[in-house]
Amino acid sequence: MLQPNNTKFRKFQKSRVKGVQSNTDQLRYGKFGIKTVSAARIPARTIEAVRRVITRKFKRLGVIWIRVFPDIAVSGKPAEVRMGKGKGAPQYWVCKVKRGAILFEFDGISPQLAKQAARLADSKLPIKTRFVMYS
């Protein structure tokens, strides 16, 4: 799974994901991509699950680029523990994704196969996405 090697801080504050993405809203590497319609936090496990689904659909053909990286640790306390006694330990990693950001790009496959893979990926993701093509 994706996670950073080291970070400046071990624990992060909770914050909201607002706004529209401006610098990663265009396809840069491939002909096809998956673009977000809403903003959310996407866990590293979800990114890995989507990557596996797309790879399986392509049957090892084509190339996949993952344009997001989970760099924010989400902390949590164990079950049945009383409140207080400090913030919990880091549990998993997420990436904040704004509306309009490109999540995945792919190339070297037919448009029909790319569209099917995008539909499968959309079912795994916790946000609404749409399929985009380089024009």
UniProtKB/Swiss-Prot annotation:
Subcellular location: Mitochondrion
Single biological process term from Gene Ontology: mitochondrial translation
Stored Pfam families: Ribosomal_L16 (PF00252)
Any GO MF annotation of the entry: rRNA binding
GO cellular component: mitochondrial large ribosomal subunit
NCBIfam families registered for this protein in UniProt: rplP_bact
Family affiliation: Belongs to the universal ribosomal protein uL16 family.
PANTHER family registered for this protein in UniProt: 50S/60S RIBOSOMAL PROTEIN L16, LARGE RIBOSOMAL SUBUNIT PROTEIN UL16M
Name of the protein in its database record: Large ribosomal subunit protein uL16m
Origin organism lineage: Eukaryota, Viridiplantae, Chlorophyta, core chlorophytes, Trebouxiophyceae
This protein's encoding gene: RPL16
